[in-house]
Amino acid sequence: MVRIAFGSIGDSFSVGSLKAYVAEFIATLLFVFAGVGSAIAYNKLTADAALDPAGLVAVAVAHAFALFVGVSIAANISGGHLNPAVTLGLAVGGNITILTGFFYWIAQLLGSTVACLLLKYVTNGLAVPTHGVAAGLNGLQGVVMEIIITFALVYTVYATAADPKKGSLGTIAPIAIGFIVGANILAAGPFSGGSMNPARSFGPAVVAGDFSQNWIYWAGPLIGGGLAGFIYGDVFIGCHTPLPTSEDYA
């Protein structure tokens, strides 16, 4: 059963919620600054050469490390979403209300945009790369790729962070989330760019003024994240039986 809740203005504007929005803004800004910054650095060091295997690994590792840190520094305040697709997936499973999730989206999009504006400034106007599908692929193929890899990301978020049965597994949630993002960039980077995150794609599109393929990075991640939220949050967690207690073995 889907457990979506709209929420209330009072809850979404509580002190705790306002702190969460600020935490999402800061963490997303730092993540995008490092992630997009690694792509800009690669282009500068190679004189805008085509991405090679070593460059792909470097960009994937930068995103994985940055997300690991971003989730870690925001986890105790906002849950460490840093991604509208993660927020939607958690909303589908009843872990955050729609209204509060909407303000998370705003914070994440603003964080990404400010990060890219800062990168544009500190690099003295170097081009901010945007996501786009590879030559020879169409938009639908890009959407399907983003659905699959975002599903993997949000499924990992549920398994390691949101599942009430996670136990000690929760301690590795940030690094597991960073690992799946890095792995997915290695797999999907040469094809769709491996975004998994509408905010990660939105900021560069704003600063570059190029929204020609940005819809792909909204449609794919939101579908994939929502599907993972439904399957894990509503089907699996919704059917959980209580964990056995010590008395059950007495």
UniProtKB/Swiss-Prot annotation:
Topology of the protein relative to the lipid bilayer: Multi-pass membrane protein
UniProt main location, coarse: membrane
TM segment ranges: 20-42, 55-77, 97-119, 140-162, 172-194, 215-237
SUPFAM superfamilies: Aquaporin-like
Keyword Membrane in record: yes
One Pfam family it belongs to: MIP
GO BP term, example: water transport
Database matches in InterPro entries: Aquaporin-like, Aquaporin_transptr, MIP, MIP_CS
Alphabetical keyword list: Membrane, Repeat, Transmembrane, Transmembrane helix, Transport, Vacuole
Signal peptide (residue range): none
Motif (NPA 2): 197-199
Gene3D superfamilies associated with the record: Glycerol uptake facilitator protein
Job of this protein: Channel protein in tonoplast. These proteins may allow the diffusion of amino acids and/or peptides from the vacuolar compartment to the cytoplasm.
Domain notes: Aquaporins contain two tandem repeats each containing three membrane-spanning domains and a pore-forming loop with the signature motif Asn-Pro-Ala (NPA).
Family: Belongs to the MIP/aquaporin (TC 1.A.8) family. TIP (TC 1.A.8.10) subfamily.
Protein name: Probable aquaporin TIP-type RB7-5A
Native organism: Nicotiana tabacum
